[in-house]
C-alpha cells in the first residue's frame, strides 16, 4: 500500500482502495487522486474540482450521474467488490505461486464474525495459503477515511 503510493506504481493484485480520498499525514490532510481517473475525467469533459471533492468523500464513483457508466465500470474500488470476488482473484494467483499470495479481503464495516469466518473458509476451500481480512473502520486512527463507506 504505502510503498506503492510513494513509488507511484501498482500495489500488485489489489484493486483501488478509492478513486480519490483524503490521507492523514503528520496531522495534515492531503488529497490523493487516481491519476488515470483524473486524466480520463479531463479528456472526457466531466472533470471539476467540486466533483473530486465529492468523490473523495465517498471514495467510489457509484451514484455520480455526471460520470459515464463505462468509466464507472473501469474504476471499481475495493469496497465495491464482494469478499467472494476478492478471494477468487487471490485463489487464481495462488494456483501459480508456491508461497502465500498477499491480498487484502475488504469487508464492510457491518461485517460479522460469521462473515469473517466465511471468508476464511472460502479461502481455504479455494486453496489460498493465507488470507488477510480488513473490516473498514475497525481500526481507530485509520490513515484514510471515507465518509460514506458502509
Enumerate the predicted regions with their spans.
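Catalytic alpha/beta core of large soluble enzyme barrels
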Residues: 2-150
Amino acid at each position: 500500500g504505502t510503498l506503492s503510493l510513494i513509488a507511484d506504481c501498482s500495489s500488485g493484485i489489489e484493486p483501488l482502495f478509492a478513486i480519490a480520498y483524503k490521507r492523514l499525514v503528520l496531522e495534515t490532510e492531503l488529497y490523493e487522486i487516481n491519476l488515470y481517473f483524473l486524466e480520463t475525467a479531463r479528456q472526457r469533459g466531466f472533470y471539476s474540482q467540486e466533483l473530486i471533492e465529492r468523490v473523495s468523500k465517498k471514495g467510489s464513483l457509484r451514484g455520480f450521474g455526471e460520470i459515464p457508466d463505462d468509466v464507472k465500470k473501469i474504476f471499481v474500488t475495493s469496497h465495491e467488490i464482494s469478499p467472494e470476488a476478492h478471494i477468487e482473484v487471490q485463489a487464481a494467483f495462488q494456483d501459480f505461486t508456491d508461497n502465500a499470495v498477499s491480498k487484502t479481503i475488504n469487508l464492510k464495516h457491518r461485517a460479522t464474525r460469521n462473515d469473517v469466518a466465511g471468508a476464511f473458509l472460502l479461502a481455504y476451500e479455494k486453496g489460498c495459503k493465507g488470507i488477510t481480512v480488513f473490516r473498514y473502520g475497525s481500526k481507530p486512527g485509520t490513515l484514510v477515511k471515507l465518509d460514506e463507506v458502509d
